[in-house]
Amino acid sequence: MLAVRSLQHLTTVIFITAYGLVLAWYIVFGASPLHRCIYAVRPAGAHNDTALVWMKINQTLLFLGPPTAPPGGAWTPHARVCYANIIEGRAVSLPAIPGAMSRRVMNVHEAVNCLEALWDTQMRLVVVGWFLYLAFVALHQRRCMFGVVSPAHSMVAPATYLLNYAGRIVSSVFLQYPYTKITRLLCELSVQRQTLVQLFEADPVTFLYHRPAIGVIVGCELLLRFVALGLIVGTALISRGACAITHPLFLTITTWCFVSIIALTELYFILRRGSAPKNAEPAAPRGRSKGWSGVCGRCCSIILSGIAVRLCYIAVVAGVVLVALRYEQEIQRRLFDL
């Protein structure tokens, strides 16, 4: 129940998703041929002991590549794109004496597809961070509904569990008799949890010492959150090496903007949550609506919200699959061919 239970976590998920989509768009469609590859070159008239220089394609220079594949084996599909932009060395006759023309001729000794490095490092970190943050959200929401939460006003009533309402409707409509076992179980769980929360707020150290499993669960939840955020922030801090000369300025600006927004959003929610008064008395329970309208309204709202969220998940997954199938050849052509 991501969209219903935690709007603050949904905000972060949306920003991470947008960051990944923008990065994927640049890798597949946005990168021009000048921003794809870098070449380790040496001037044609230079000695063999001259250091290699990494540079991107330059239309004012003539790049001469090796006529055959490297000794270690055939070129990878990613590297083949880079070698397709240069001329084979045996197809050009150089002057015997190095001159102005020879200084504009570069012998290519190695080529690297920077989009491959961008896909294997930055994009992979974003995807892993996205999944880890979703795992944190799922674990946190289950703990708010069934586990120990402090402050107490952060707890979610277990009676709102979707399976409880679904079981009651199925038993009433199809079996023609009320089914209340899940409801009684959730009520007992709510009473026990309120007692545990009071013990935890009174003495957290002793509470966690006698119940280490709860501490392990909370620790795993925090670990998932900070590792996910660390991976997202790491996408802006990792060194791109020689490939930095091929990335345009807007890619760097976009990366830092998304990383800053995600980090500041999480920091804001953490500080706002920590400033909430822990000794605040719980609000008085609202009066329950009488009649069929109140029962049906509350029941249907929770069920329909759960169904709507799950339909949104299915629609997103189906959309990604359909787009991948529709543009599969285009994506492969962008990544592997000219």
UniProtKB/Swiss-Prot annotation:
Keywords: Glycoprotein, Host cell membrane, Host endosome, Host Golgi apparatus, Host membrane, Membrane, Signal, Syncytium formation induced by viral infection, Transmembrane, Transmembrane helix, Viral primary envelope fusion with host outer nuclear membrane, Viral release from host cell
Record topological domains on the Cytoplasmic side: 141-212, 265-301
Main subcellular localisation: host cell
Residues making up the signal peptide according to the UniProt record: 1-30
Locations listed in the record: Host cell membrane; Host endosome membrane; Host Golgi apparatus membrane
Topology of this chain in the membrane: Multi-pass membrane protein
One annotated Gene Ontology cellular component of this protein: host cell endosome membrane
InterPro entries per UniProt: GK
Region (Involved in fusion): 31-121
Transmembrane segments: 122-140, 213-233, 244-264, 302-322
Stretches for region Interaction with UL20: 265-301
Glycosylation, residue list: 48, 58
Protein origin, superkingdom: Viruses
GO BP terms: fusion of viral membrane with host outer nuclear membrane; symbiont-mediated induction of syncytium formation
Phosphoprotein recorded as keyword: no
PTMs per UniProt: N-glycosylated.
Positions on the Extracellular side per record topology: 31-121, 234-243, 323-338
Chain's role: Glycoprotein that probably modulates membrane fusion events during secondary envelopment of cytoplasmic capsids that bud into specific trans-Golgi network (TGN)-derived membranes. Also plays a role, together with gB, in virus-induced cell-to-cell fusion (syncytia formation). Seems to block fusion of virions with infected-cell membranes.
Entry's family note: Belongs to the alphaherpesvirinae glycoprotein K family.
Summary of subunit composition and partner proteins: Interacts (via UL20 interaction region) with protein UL20 (via N-terminus); this interaction probably plays a role in the coordinate transport of protein UL20 and gK to the trans-Golgi network (TGN), and is required for the cell surface expression of gK.
Protein name: Envelope glycoprotein K
Species of the source: Human herpesvirus 2 (strain HG52)
